[in-house]
């Protein structure tokens, strides 16, 4: 991994940014160089094949290159924004004789609306809502959930780590062990909140929302899980949707499953129909139950996790998750 190659990445990024004219251009370049599958992360993955001395030296160079490219990205984004403001000031005219605007009535944000609908449904089924910390430790986020040390979600380029133990939680599943240790049986809870992962494109943002659901008692089985989730999805999308329940794998459930919805492509009928993943679920792994102080030979339970932005996007036939967080009033006024 020559040092010259890494230095050239900075030059390439600078040249590409100089030719960019819009924020969208800059963002595409940022993903190309700094994204999850970008040039920099490709180089980071090669470090493991080096000896310790070279690994330390090259790692330092890569981090410096990453920092330099990020700074170039910020500077170019700022410059384009300033030019856009200047152009707007020079071309737009203000008629001071126009009457003032009347106060506008606000609307509920689509994410908040989805959360309210989810909360109402599960509250009617007797689920109690609990809350957990967004700054989590590795035990509750990974270790107690039977997630192995070599799992990709533990990597630096996937998770926001503060140090070797503290991180921004990557899922709401960390609430499971806390609930098992502090809530008497039977357990029937949901937890709704923000989670964080290092990803940014039209399908992912660094912060998004999840709901975690869990039920533990004697004789809980997969049929109970499927019935509750199908009832919820039919309530949310309508009874005409087509769902698919299929086997999957998660380290904290056994057996594991995912539910897909058939996308009918209402906005583009030329596109073929396709299955879209909705949520992950399964029967809680015996190891996880034991970690929570529950005898896995006497009790069983299920758990599920649902991305709230994904539900909302499918409900309103949206294609870009980022619009939820851009504070665009023209977009928000639709809801």
Curated annotation (Swiss-Prot):
GO MF: ATP binding; magnesium ion binding; phenylalanine-tRNA ligase activity; tRNA binding
Keywords: Aminoacyl-tRNA synthetase, ATP-binding, Cytoplasm, Ligase, Magnesium, Metal-binding, Nucleotide-binding, Protein biosynthesis
The enzyme's E.C. designation: 6.1.1.20
Cofactor note: Binds 2 magnesium ions per tetramer.
A GO cellular-component term linked to this record: cytoplasm
Record's keyword annotation contains Lyase: no
Binding positions for Mg(2+) per the UniProt entry: 254
Top-level taxon in the UniProt lineage: Bacteria
Cofactor: Mg(2+)
Catalytic activity from the UniProt record: tRNA(Phe) + L-phenylalanine + ATP = L-phenylalanyl-tRNA(Phe) + AMP + diphosphate + H(+)
Enzyme class: ligase
GO biological process, alphabetically ordered: phenylalanyl-tRNA aminoacylation
Family annotation (InterPro entries): aa-tRNA-synth_II, aa-tRNA-synth_II/BPL/LPL, Phe-tRNA-synth_IIc_asu, Phe-tRNA_ligase_II_N, Phe_tRNA_ligase_alpha1_bac, Phenylalanyl-tRNA_Synthase, tRNA-bd_arm
Compartment list: Cytoplasm
Keyword Repressor: no
Subunit structure: Tetramer of two alpha and two beta subunits.
NCBIfam families in the cross-refs: pheS
Family: Belongs to the class-II aminoacyl-tRNA synthetase family. Phe-tRNA synthetase alpha subunit type 1 subfamily.
Name of the protein in its database record: Phenylalanine--tRNA ligase alpha subunit
